[in-house]
Amino acid sequence: MRGSLIVVAGIALVVVTISAQGNEKPSEAFTKAMRDNADAARAIRVASKEFEESGAGAQDFDPFEKAAATMKASFTTTLTYWQAQKVDGAVGLSEKALKHVAALEAGAKERDYRLVLEASTALNETCASCHMAHRVRTDDGAYEIKIK
C-alpha cells in the first residue's frame, strides 16, 4: 500500500512538473503589447457601435485608423516574441493578425465600413484562436504563455 502511494505521488509530481515547464510568464514587452491590443480592440468596438448608431450621420474613421496603428506596433512585438520562442503556430497567427490589421487600416483609409467590419471580425477570431491555443489563466487570475 505504501509503495502504491509513493508511485502515485511520484507520477503526480512528474505531471505537475511537465505541465509547469510548458508555461511561462510573458515578457513585459509582450504583456504591454497584449494590453495595447485589448485597448485598441475596445476602441474598435466602441467606434463600431457609434458608427452603426449614427446611420447616415457623421461617421468617424479616425478611431479605426488609430487602433490599426496601435495594433500594427503591438502585433509586431507579438510576432517577434513568438519567433524567439520558436512556436510556429503562434508565429502564423501573429502574421495573420498583422494582415487583418493591414486590412483594417486600408478599410479605414478608404472610409469603407464594410472592410473595417470584416477585418475587425477576422482579427477577433484570430486573437481568440491564439489565446485558446497559447494562453493559460493562472490561479491568481494572471495569464501565462503555453510554450509547448
Annotate each PLM feature.
Residues 1-4:
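Positively charged n-region of N-terminal signal peptides that target proteins for export
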Residues 123-134:
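The canonical Cys-X-X-Cys-His
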Residues 20-124, 139-148:
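Extracytoplasmic c-type cytochrome modules immediately beyond a signal peptide or single-pass transmembrane anchor
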Residues 7-16:
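Bacterial N-terminal signal peptides
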